[in-house]
């Protein structure tokens, strides 16, 4: 199986609009946004989905959520949604764990 697109983005083999990065996670703009502001926060390590987390991955979920919170503050979002899609039936399109940061709506949208 070919390496997934998010692994290639994490290795900087494919360009993306990176908003923040540390040793374990990377956040970048979604190329098919579902909201005025739509970023994906991914672990650099390939993990297929939440359903595939092992005991040694416990800290990665905290790091994904905390990184999304920091990015939302950096973007000055007043409100936002954090969403994990798990499996094809749950709406997951890319088989690499990722957290959607969605926001930027104005009142009434």
Regions found by a protein language model. Give the residues of each.
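HIT superfamily nucleotide-processing domains
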Residues: 1-109
